[in-house]
Amino acid sequence: MSKIAVYPGSFDPITMGHVDIINRISPLYDEVIVLVAQSSQKQSMFSVEERKTLIEKALSHLKNVKVDIFGGLTVEYMKKAKAQVIVRGLRAVSDFEYEMTMANMNRKLAPDFETLLVFASPEFYYISSRGVKEVAINGGALKGLVPDVVVEAMENKIRK
């Protein structure tokens, strides 16, 4: 049986913190699925299709990583994908409470799945998608905060 992990999120946009976590977990699994959440509750800078494309370009160096879009419960997607592990990143202590609640909810819904919490590397712990959007909107430098392909896409989006 293949070891498959799912890393769900909105990834609007994918940041270097996300890329770092994916780089670090990809050697641990046969397949890592970056699952782009389709949410009508959030105002997004990029459509889910644009996010999927940007992530694919940013992670093209990782051959065991694929990107997919899903609009339902992560555990339902995991059943279809035959995945065993949900990966979540932790930047700060404040993330822990939310992630613990979600992990326990997922365990209630699907007792066979595990949640792997991965601490952000120190050089990326301060980066968030929301913060990156603020920097972009206010004309700040995005280099090092997001992959180069995302820098270009964000600059083009803001110019419009």
Swiss-Prot record:
Keyword Magnesium (UniProt): yes
Binding site for ATP: 10-11, 18, 89-91, 99, 124-130
One Pfam family per UniProt: CTP_transf_like
GO cellular component: cytoplasm
Cofactor: Mg(2+)
SUPFAM superfamilies, A to Z: Nucleotidylyl transferase
Record-listed E.C. numbers: 2.7.7.3
Subcellular location: Cytoplasm
One record GO biological process: coenzyme A biosynthetic process
EC main group: transferase
Record-annotated site: Transition state stabilizer: 18
Keywords recorded for this protein, A-Z: ATP-binding, Coenzyme A biosynthesis, Cytoplasm, Magnesium, Nucleotide-binding, Nucleotidyltransferase, Transferase
Xref: InterPro entries: Cyt_trans-like (IPR004821), PPAT (IPR001980), Rossmann-like_a/b/a_fold (IPR014729)
Entry's family note: Belongs to the bacterial CoaD family.
Function: Reversibly transfers an adenylyl group from ATP to 4'-phosphopantetheine, yielding dephospho-CoA (dPCoA) and pyrophosphate.
Protein name: Phosphopantetheine adenylyltransferase
